[in-house]
From Swiss-Prot:
Stated role: Binds the lower part of the 30S subunit head. Binds mRNA in the 70S ribosome, positioning it for translation.
Name of the encoding gene: rpsC
Family: Belongs to the universal ribosomal protein uS3 family.
Protein name (Swiss-Prot/TrEMBL): Small ribosomal subunit protein uS3
GO molecular function: mRNA binding; rRNA binding; structural constituent of ribosome
Residue ranges of domain KH type-2 in the record: 39-107
Swiss-Prot/TrEMBL keywords: Ribonucleoprotein, Ribosomal protein, RNA-binding, rRNA-binding
Length: 232
């Protein structure tokens, strides 16, 4: 059987950034890793309906900074920022250091593999036909400018006795081109027949220049020069 390397793992440090960025000595490493896991577990459960794409954790100077990438920032922030303040306090308790939470909006959820996979699983749980859900996700992604997309579902599809795997692809998805910007993620649909797994690969184009091109900061807005009034 042909085994495939994880599309995100093979591109780390080339065109993909890590979801946790911090340095620690041998003694602190395990504690930091454990608290990262618990923070992610808590936020994923708490923000299940907020369309969270990814959670990035940084640890600058005995503190923790969490960036939540979401398609629905209003749900995360809450009325006058009440909800995000509650999250901040719990995260600080879990990590044992002062916490800061930033919210980043996902502008095009149709081009985010995690959000596409979650959308398909929610449709499968509502008993939508799996082929229709797959085709709709593929069409939406291609319409918004994806170079290619592949969706795979596996399990007791349509309540069949024997589990099987089906996939649908449009465009090109070059899994072994390291400079290819491929967003990959998975999700699980818990149906009455059992669990159905969903995998999504979205190819957004090739990144030339490696991590330098990915992490290039946006140019700061320049202050407008005041025009001198001409003499009359």
């Amino acid at each position: 059987m042909g085994q495939k390397v994880h599309p995100n793992g093979i591109r780390l440090g080339i065109v993909k950034a890590w979801n946790s960025t911090w340095y620690a000595n041998t003694k602190e490493f395990a504690d930091n890793l454990d608290s990262d896991f618990k923070v992610r577990q808590f936020l994923t459960k708490e923000l299940a309906k907020a369309s969270v794409s990814r959670i990035v954790i940084e640890r600058p100077a005995k503190s923790i900074r969490v960036t939540i990438h979401t398609a629905r920032p209003g749900i995360v922030i809450g009325k006058k920022g009440e909800d995000v303040e509650k999250l901040r306090k719990v995260v600080a308790d879990i990590a044992g250091v002062p916490a800061q939470i930033n919210i980043a909006e996902v502008r095009k959820p149709e081009l985010d593999a995690k959000l596409v996979a979650d959308s398909i699983t929610s449709q499968l749980e509502r008993r939508v036909m799996f082929r229709r859900a797959m085709k709709r996700a593929v069409q939406n992604a291609m319409r918004l400018g994806a170079k290619g997309i592949k969706v795979e579902v596996s399990g007791r599809l349509g309540g069949a006795e024997i589990a099987r795997t089906e996939w649908y692809r449009e465009g090109r998805v070059p899994l072994h081109t390291l400079r290819a910007d491929i967003d990959y993620n998975t999700s699980e649909a818990h149906t009455t027949y059992g669990v159905i797994g969903v995998k999504v690969w979205i190819f957004k184009g090739e990144i030339l220049g490696g991590m330098a091109a990915v992490e290039q900061p946006e140019p700061a807005a320049q202050p407008k020069k005041q025009q001198r009034k001409g003499r009359k």
